[in-house]
A protein has these predicted regions:
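Non-transmembrane "mature" sequence context
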Residues: 1-110
C-alpha cells in the first residue's frame, strides 16, 4: 500500500488534478493527509489497474459515511485486517468480494 500525492494519482490515471479532486469530492475514493508533510494523498489500492476506483468502493464509502465514519475512520476500517474476510476490506474489494464487504460496512453502523 502506498499513499500517492494527488499529482502522482493524476499522472498514473491520465486525469488532470481537478478530476482527481472530483473523485474525492464525489466519494468515489478517500483521501488522507500524510502525517509527515500534510500532503493530501490517495491510497493506491483504491484504484484498479485501469486507474478507476475499485468496484464497490464508492458504495462502501457511502455506507461508512452514513454510519457517521469520518473519512479517516473509513480509510482505517478499509485497511484493517478482518479475520472473517480474511484480509482487509479493501483487499476483498480488489478481489471482487464487494457483497461481503458491503454487509460488514452496513453492520459497522450498528
Amino acid at each position: 500500500m502506498e499513499l500517492l500525492p494527488l499529482p502522482d494519482v493524476a499522472e498514473r490515471t491520465g486525469r488532470d488534478i481537478m478530476a482527481v479532486r472530483q473523485l474525492i469530492k464525489d466519494g468515489r475514493v478517500l483521501a488522507a493527509r500524510r502525517p509527515d508533510d500534510d500532503i493530501l494523498c490517495i491510497l493506491d489500492e483504491q484504484l484498479d489497474e485501469a486507474g478507476e476506483p475499485v468496484k464497490h468502493l464508492p458504495a462502501v464509502i457511502t455506507l461508512l459515511r452514513d454510519a457517521k465514519y469520518t473519512d479517516e475512520e473509513a480509510l482505517r476500517w478499509l485497511t484493517t485486517p478482518d479475520d472473517s474476510l480474511p484480509g482487509t476490506p479493501l483487499q476483498a474489494l480488489r478481489e471482487n468480494r464487494g457483497t461481503e464487504v458491503k454487509r460488514r460496512a452496513q453492520a459497522a453502523g450498528f
